[in-house]
C-alpha cells in the first residue's frame, strides 16, 4: 500500500477495472430481487454542471447501496438529445444540430465516467437516433387509431424570434422564456394527445404513490384541477344565440350581475363586426398573452359588447362584457360574474361601475362591508328566493337541481388540465408520423415506412426548419397515392415520457418494448430529478405509463414507486459595474475574499483588481457566471472528494451551497481515512476478533462501530438522509483515530472497524474504498461485497465506565455492570483507595449521580 493518497492514480485504475469487467451490467435474473434506480437523463448541452453531478451522485449512492444489499441493480444512462438549444448552437457555430449533439454526448459521457458513476452503458439511449424514435412514431399512430390523438386549429403562444409555439409555462411576463421577445397569438393546426381522458386516473392514482414527495403530488393535483360544478346555458336577449358558462358556485347564482367572455369567443367576435372600438380591444386582448399564473395580478380590462343575457330564474337582463381575464381554452371561454362573492369579478365591477348583488352572508351573522371587498367564503344564502336561509351544500344542490329541472343546467366534473399539444414547428425533433393525401385526407404512416427519419446533414439558416424549407423532403407515397409528410416535429417531452421503459430492452427491434424484460424491471424503484419537472415531465411520465399499460406493454399502474427531488446547487455570485453601467459577472474561481470573524464576506476583489459586489448565494447559472466546472474540481481533488462533498454538505432535497472550503474538508477526511488504514497496515491483526476477550475500552469502541453501522444503514436505506450517515461515519473516524493499536485485540477491533467504514463509504466514495478494501486484505472486489450488518450483541452495554469525583476533581474511574444501582456504585466508589485518601477526615454532605457516567462526593 502506498503511503500517500493519490486519487489521480487510483480513480483511473478503478474505472478501467469497472469498464473491463462490465461491473454494472444489468441482466434479468428471475431468482433475484431487482432494483431499478433512475436519474433523469441530461440534455447534452456540452458540459456537465454541478446540478447533474448532484443528481447522478445521489442515484449512484442508492444503486451501490442496493447492490451491496443483494439486489439485482439496473442503473442506466442516456441522452435527451432533441430540443431547441441544439438549433441555436448549430446556427452560432455553423454546424448541424446532429453533429453538435453527438460531439457533446461524447464529451459528457467521458465526464460521467470520470466521476465514477456505475451506469450500465450497454443500455445507453440517445433519443435523436431513429432506432429510438421509430417506436415513438409507431406508438403515436396506435394512439391515433384508438381515438386518443386529434388535430385541431388552436391559438398558440408564438415567439416570432424563435418561430416556435410556446407552452403557457414558457411565457414569462408576456415574453418568450428563452429570448424575451414579446409573444404573439397565432392560430395554427396542431396535433394533440387526449391526456384529459386520463385526468381522473392521473388524479386518483396519486394515492398509489406514498413515497413521492407531498409537494409534487399537491402540484399535480392542482394542475389537474378537478372541480365539481354546474354548466349553465343563458339565452342571449333578442337573438337565438346562447352562452354557456361553468361554475363551481351555483349557490351564488342569484348574485350574477354580468357575464364575461374571452376575446376569442365567437359571441365577442360577432359583436365586434359593427363595432370598431370593440374590434380594436379584442385584437389587443388576443395579442397580450399571459401565463395563467399571472392572471390574478394583471390589470383587469374589459369592454361591453352591447349584448345582454337573460337570467333563467329571475328574467333579469345581464350585460355581456369581453374581459382579458377570461381564457378561451379554459372551460367554455365564458364566465358568470358575481362581484359580491368573487374578488376578481369585484375588482372588474368596481372599475366599470357594474352593480353587485349580495346573496351570501357570513354563517355567524356578522356584518360584511361590501364596499371594501367581496365575501368569498361559504355561508348562509340570502336574496335567493326559496333558497334563503340554506347553507352552502343545500343551496348548491337545490339550485343545481332546479337548473337541471328547467333544462338550462347540468352537473359536471371539470378539469383544469388541457390536452397535450405535441406539435412543434422546429427542425430538431422527431418527425410526426402523419401523412396528408391529395384529397386532403390525413392517414397514419404505416409501420413499414417507419421511422420517418429526420435528415441530420443539414444547414441551419436560423429562419426556417430545413424540412419545411425543402419541399422535396415532405413528398412520399401512400398505397400508390401521392402524399405529404407532416413537417412539424414532436414536443421533446414525448421522448422523455417513455425512455425509462425503453432502458429495459434498448436493443429490442421486434417491438417498442420486450414485455418480459420490461415487466421484470418496471416499475422504477427510485426516480431522482428536480422538482421543476413536477407538472410537466412527471405528469407526462405517469400518463405515458398508463398508455403503455393499456397497450399491453406494462402491468403496473405507475412508472415509479419512489421519487426524490434533489435541491439546486448554489454558489456565490459576484459582479462589478462597467463604465457603460453594465453588470459584469465574475466567476467565483477568480475572486479573492476577505471574511469577518463570523465567516461573512466583507471584501471581494477579482484577478484584475475590480472591487466586487457580492450578490449572495444564487443558483449556479451561465448568466451569473457562478457555475463551477466539475471537471476542474475532479482534477484538483478527485471524484471521490467531489462526491463526498455533494452528499455531505446538505440534505438531498435541500439546496446545496457550494463552498470550496467544504470540498477541502471532504478531501482532508479521505486523507485521514487513507492514513489510518496505512498506519494499521504497518502492523495488522494476526488473529481473529474474540468478543469475549475484549477490555472495556475495546468493547466501547466496538459498540460505537456497530451503532454507527445501524445508523448509517437506516439513514441511507430508509431515511435517505445521506448527510447524517456521513456525519456518523466522521464521528466514528474521530474515535478510531484516537484508538490504541498496542495489542492484538486492539488491532482486531480496528480491522473490523476499518472494514465496516470502507463498506459504508463505498457507495459514496467508491474509488478510494475499492482500493482500501484490497489493502485491508480482502480477496474479492468490494463492488459485490455484502453491506455490513450491525451486531445487536455488540451494541448492548453490559458495562459502564463511571467517573468518581471528590469535590469536583476526578479521583477514580470504575467499570461497573450496566444495571448496577446507585447505592452499589457508591459502595464501589468508597472502596477505591484514592477516593478514601481524599475523603479522609471529611464528612460527606451530598452525593450526585449522573446515571452510567458520574458519581460525585461533596465533602467538608
From Swiss-Prot:
Keywords of this entry: Aminoacyl-tRNA synthetase, ATP-binding, Cytoplasm, Ligase, Nucleotide-binding, Protein biosynthesis
CDD domains: Anticodon_Ia_Leu_BEm (cd07958), LeuRS_core (cd00812)
The EC number(s) this enzyme carries: 6.1.1.4
Signal peptide boundaries: none
Keyword Cytoplasm attached: yes
Family: Belongs to the class-I aminoacyl-tRNA synthetase family.
The protein, known as: Leucine--tRNA ligase
Species assigned in the record: Histophilus somni (strain 2336)
GN (gene name): leuS
Amino acid at each position: 500500500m502506498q503511503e500517500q493518497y493519490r486519487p489521480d492514480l487510483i480513480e483511473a485504475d478503478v474505472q478501467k477495472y469497472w469498464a473491463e469487467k462490465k461491473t454494472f451490467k444489468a441482466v434479468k435474473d428471475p431468482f433475484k430481487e431487482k432494483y431499478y434506480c433512475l436519474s433523469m437523463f441530461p440534455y447534452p448541452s456540452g458540459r456537465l454542471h454541478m446540478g447533474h453531478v448532484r443528481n447522478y451522485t445521489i442515484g449512484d449512492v442508492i444503486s451501490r447501496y442496493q447492490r451491496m444489499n443483494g439486489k439485482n441493480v439496473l442503473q442506466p444512462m442516456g441522452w435527451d438529445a432533441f430540443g431547441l438549444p441544439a438549433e441555436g448552437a448549430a446556427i452560432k457555430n455553423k454546424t448541424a444540430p446532429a453533429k453538435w449533439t453527438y460531439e457533446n454526448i461524447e464529451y459528457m459521457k467521458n465526464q460521467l465516467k470520470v466521476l465514477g458513476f456505475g451506469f450500465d452503458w450497454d443500455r445507453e439511449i440517445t433519443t435523436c437516433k431513429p432506432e429510438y424514435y421509430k417506436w415513438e412514431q409507431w406508438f403515436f399512430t396506435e394512439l391515433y387509431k384508438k381515438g386518443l390523438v386529434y388535430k385541431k386549429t388552436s391559438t398558440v403562444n408564438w415567439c416570432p424570434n424563435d418561430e416556435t409555439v410556446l407552452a403557457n409555462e414558457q411565457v414569462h411576463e408576456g415574453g418568450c422564456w428563452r429570448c424575451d421577445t414579446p409573444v404573439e397569438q397565432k392560430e395554427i393546426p396542431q396535433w394533440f394527445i387526449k391526456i384529459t381522458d386520463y385526468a381522473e386516473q392521473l388524479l386518483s392514482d396519486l394515492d398509489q404513490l406514498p413515497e413521492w414527495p407531498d409537494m409534487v403530488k399537491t402540484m399535480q393535483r392542482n394542475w389537474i384541477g378537478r372541480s365539481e360544478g354546474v354548466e349553465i346555458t343563458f339565452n342571449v336577449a333578442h337573438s337565438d344565440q346562447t352562452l354557456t358558462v361553468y361554475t363551481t358556485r351555483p349557490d351564488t347564482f342569484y348574485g350574477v350581475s354580468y357575464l364575461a367572455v374571452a376575446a376569442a369567443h365567437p359571441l365577442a367576435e360577432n359583436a365586434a363586426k359593427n363595432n370598431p372600438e370593440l374590434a380594436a380591444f379584442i385584437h389587443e386582448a388576443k395579442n397580450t398573452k399571459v401565463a395563467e399564473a399571472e392572471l390574478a395580478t394583471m390589470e383587469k380590462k374589459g369592454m361591453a359588447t352591447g349584448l345582454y343575457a337573460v337570467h333563467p330564474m329571475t328574467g333579469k337582463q345581464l350585460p355581456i362584457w369581453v374581459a382579458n381575464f377570461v381564457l378561451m381554452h379554459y372551460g367554455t371561454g365564458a364566465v358568470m360574474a358575481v362581484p359580491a362573492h368573487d374578488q376578481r369579478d369585484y375588482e372588474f365591477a368596481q372599475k366599470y361601475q357594474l352593480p353587485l348583488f349580495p346573496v351570501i352572508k357570513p354563517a355567524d351573522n356578522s356584518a360584511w362591508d361590501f364596499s371594501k371587498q367581496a365575501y368569498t367564503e361559504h355561508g348562509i344564502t340570502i336574496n335567493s328566493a326559496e333558497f334563503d336561509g340554506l347553507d352552502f351544500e343545500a343551496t348548491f344542490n337545490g339550485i343545481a337541481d332546479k337548473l337541471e329541472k328547467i333544462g338550462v343546467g347540468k352537473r359536471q366534473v371539470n378539469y383544469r388540465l388541457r390536452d397535450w399539444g405535441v406539435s412543434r414547428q422546429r427542425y430538431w425533433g422527431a418527425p410526426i408520423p402523419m401523412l396528408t393525401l391529395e384529397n386532403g385526407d390525413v392517414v397514419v404512416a404505416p409501420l413499414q415506412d417507419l421511422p420517418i427519419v429526420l435528415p441530420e446533414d443539414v444547414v441551419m439558416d436560423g429562419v426556417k426548419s430545413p424540412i419545411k424549407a425543402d419541399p422535396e423532403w415532405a413528398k412520399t407515397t401512400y398505397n400508390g397515392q401521392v402524399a405529404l409528410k407532416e413537417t412539424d416535429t414532436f414536443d421533446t417531452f414525448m421522448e422523455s415520457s417513455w425512455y425509462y421503459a425503453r432502458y429495459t430492452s434498448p436493443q429490442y427491434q421486434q417491438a417498442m418494448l420486450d414485455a418480459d424484460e420490461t415487466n421484470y424491471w418496471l416499475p422504477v424503484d427510485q426516480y431522482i430529478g428536480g422538482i421543476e419537472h413536477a407538472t410537466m415531465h412527471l405528469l407526462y411520465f405517469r400518463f405515458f405509463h398508463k398508455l403503455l399499460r393499456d397497450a399491453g406493454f406494462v402491468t403496473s399502474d405507475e412508472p415509479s414507486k419512489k421519487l426524490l427531488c434533489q435541491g439546486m446547487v448554489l454558489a456565490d455570485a459576484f459582479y462589478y459595474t462597467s463604465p457603460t453601467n453594465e453588470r459584469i459577472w465574475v466567476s467565483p474561481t477568480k475572486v479573492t475574499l476577505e471574511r469577518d470573524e463570523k465567516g461573512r464576506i466583507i471584501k471581494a476583489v477579482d484577478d484584475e483588481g475590480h472591487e466586487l459586489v457580492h450578490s449572495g448565494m444564487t443558483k449556479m447559472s451561465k448568466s451569473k457566471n457562478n457555475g463551477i466546472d466539475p471537471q476542474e474540481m475532479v482534477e484538483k481533488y478527485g471524484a471521490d472528494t467531489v462526491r463526498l462533498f455533494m452528499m455531505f454538505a446538505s440534505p438531498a432535497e435541500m439546496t446545496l451551497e457550494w463552498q470550496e472550503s467544504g470540498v477541502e474538508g471532504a478531501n482532508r477526511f479521505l486523507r485521514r481515512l487513507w492514513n489510518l488504514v496505512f498506519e494499521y497496515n504497518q502492523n495488522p491483526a494476526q488473529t481473529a476478533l474474540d468478543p469475549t476477550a475484549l477490555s472495556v475500552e475495546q468493547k466501547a469502541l466496538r459498540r460505537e462501530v456497530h451503532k454507527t453501522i445501524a445508523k448509517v444503514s437506516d439513514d441511507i436505506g430508509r431515511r435517505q438522509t445521506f448527510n447524517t450517515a456521513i456525519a456518523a461515519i466522521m464521528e466514528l473516524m474521530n474515535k478510531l483515530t484516537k484508538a490504541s493499536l498496542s495489542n492484538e485485540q486492539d488491532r482486531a477491533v480496528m480491522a473490523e472497524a476499518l472494514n465496516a467504514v470502507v463498506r459504508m463509504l463505498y457507495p459514496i466514495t467508491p474509488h478510494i474504498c475499492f482500493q482500501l478494501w484490497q489493502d485491508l486484505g480482502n480477496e474479492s472486489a468490494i463492488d459485490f461485497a455484502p453491506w455490513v450488518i450491525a451486531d445487536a450483541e455488540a451494541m448492548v452495554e453490559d458495562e459502564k465506565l463511571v467517573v468518581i469525583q471528590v469535590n469536583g476533581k476526578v479521583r477514580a474511574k470504575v467499570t461497573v455492570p450496566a444495571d448496577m444501582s446507585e447505592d452499589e456504585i457508591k459502595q464501589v466508589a468508597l472502596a477505591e483507595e484514592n477516593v478514601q485518601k481524599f475523603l479522609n477526615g471529611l464528612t460527606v454532605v451530598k452525593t450526585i449521580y449522573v446515571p452510567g457516567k458520574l458519581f460525585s462526593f461533596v465533602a467538608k
